[in-house]
Amino acid sequence: MAVLLRGLVGTDTQSYIDIIGLIDKDIDASVEIGFYLTTKVLLLLTNDALVITKILAIWMFVNFGLFFSKNKERIYIYTLLVMPLFFFDMYMNGLRYGVAYSFAILAYDQQIKKNNLRFLILIALAISFHISSIILIALLFANYLRNINGKSLFIIAAIVGAFTFFFKDRILLKLMQYSSIESPGALSGIMPLLIFILTVGLVVVSAKKQSVLFLMCVLCFAEILSFIMSRYSYMGMRIQFIIILVLFCKLPELIYFRLQAFLVMFFISLLCFTGRYRNMADEFGNGPSPFMPYHYYWEVK
């Protein structure tokens, strides 16, 4: 309800309203093709840009629900970890990457079920909404790299190569946009790094099997690189949160859900919530659509 009843709430909400306005005028707006086409369809139903952002948020909510409602362990993860860290950011702010990541984790589920057609469709949808979903997809399947053969490697290289060729202009544009955004501050990347370290600690004390070692090494290496990058560019911090989301999604496969695990998760949950709240409080009243103070849609002037 907080998402549906909100007015201009969320740092990027006004930016999305402006983007939707450009799309309504048939202007490219420098967004991914999936988001562009979806917005064009939604504009046939309503010309209220704020309503369109809420429809996208509902779509995202349904996708995440389909993934995390599969078993009780995933429900625990969604409630204790995903919601405190990502709820406000995705549902009320970063709609494009939120929808993209929701498609990416659904694709992961379909690949586990060996449903290759649905997997490819969902991968295409994820990438068409936000280019950074490629990183999420790659890390979700990182533990399969140990068993990859030459044929699979060739297919992956061909798909990545074809995608890069056809969308090279958009990829370069995104890289330029992110690289131009400087690190928010001296402590940038510290909060996601701390959350990652605590979650790795959770895996260490509650791991189901030794085979998690390879995946954890890959994620730790990626986290170190992205943390270093976050000192200089916003892109690094974005990748840090992608890595955390991957780790959260994989936890039901990695750990036993015993009392000690729940205690650690509860502590991480508090850290996630307080970190997000501090960021919102620091931006109180700043910009055209800050998170705080919260207001309802009928209060929009």
Task: For each feature predicted by the language model, list its residue ranges.
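Transmembrane-helix signature of polytopic, membrane-embedded enzymes
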Residues: G65-L85
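Transmembrane signal-anchor helices characteristic of membrane glycosylation enzymes that use polyprenol
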Residues: M1-G10, I268-G275
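Alpha-helical transmembrane segments and terminal signal-anchor/GPI-anchor hydrophobic tails
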Residues: V9, T13-Y36, L136-L247, G275-V300
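Loop-to-helix entry region of an early transmembrane alpha helix in multi-pass inner-membrane enzymes
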Residues: L45-W59
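Membrane-interface transmembrane helices that cradle and orient dolichyl/undecaprenyl
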Residues: A104-R118
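Signature aromatic-anchored transmembrane alpha helix within multi-pass, membrane-resident enzymes
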Residues: F154-I159, F257-T274
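Short acidic/glycine- and proline-prone juxtamembrane loop motifs at membrane-interface regions
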Residues: M92-G98
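Membrane-interface alpha helices of multi-pass inner-membrane proteins
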Residues: F87-D89, R118-A142, A222-M229
